[in-house]
A protein has these predicted regions:
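Catalytic DNA-binding helix-loop module of base-excision-repair DNA glycosylases/AP lyases
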Residues: 10, 89-125
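Short, hydrophobic/amphipathic alpha-helical patches that form generic packing surfaces
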Residues: 3-13
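Amphipathic alpha-helical segments that form the core helices of the histone-fold
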Residues: 9, 26-29
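Residue-level marker of structural boundaries
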Residues: 29, 55, 117-118
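Non-catalytic DNA-binding core/recognition domains of DNA-processing enzymes
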Residues: 17-27, 60-69
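Alpha-helical ds-nucleic-acid-binding substructure associated with the helix-hairpin-helix region
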Residues: 32-102
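Short helix-capping/linker segments at secondary-structure and domain boundaries
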Residues: 12-22, 73-79, 118-120
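A generic alpha-helix surface/boundary motif
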Residues: 4, 18-21, 92
């Protein structure tokens, strides 16, 4: 679930979608695919990966934003999007919680939550 979230995070930035995918793949290859791994990486390390992925602007802002987003996710939800989802009453609440994370707006939350509809549907059964 986190890898999908990370890709959605990149899709929400003012970059080409191809750049978002390349950057996401680099994060996965470099084992920067958990909130804790991103928090442990220095801003300089994140900037280098973002640059390698094709970011020509906003690398520092994005690196800092990732740190802020991951810090809150770890502090409030033990680093688990699944925990956030399970503690939400419905998709609307889940979307609102996502949007409290730095860098997550309504569109990113909408893209991400498309993949969680099934979880909420199972609760009703």
């Amino acid at each position: 679930m986190f890898r999908w979230f990370l890709l959605c995070y990149f899709f929400g930035k003012p970059i080409r979608s191809e750049t978002a995918v390349v950057t996401w793949r680099l994060f996965v290859e470099m084992k920067l695919d958990t909130p804790w791994a991103i928090l442990e990486a220095s801003e300089r390390q994140l900037v280098a990966v973002l640059h390698e992925g094709g970011y020509t602007r906003y690398q520092h802002v994005t690196a800092r934003g990732l740190h802020v987003c991951m810090d809150r996710l770890v502090r409030e939800y033990e680093g688990s999007l699944y925990f956030m989802l399970e503690s939400s009453l419905d998709e609307t609440e889940f979307s609102k919680r996502l949007q409290k994370l730095h860098g997550i707006g309504p569109k990113v939350a909408e893209i991400f939550t498309r993949e969680t509809t099934e979880v909420f549907a199972r609760r009703v059964e």
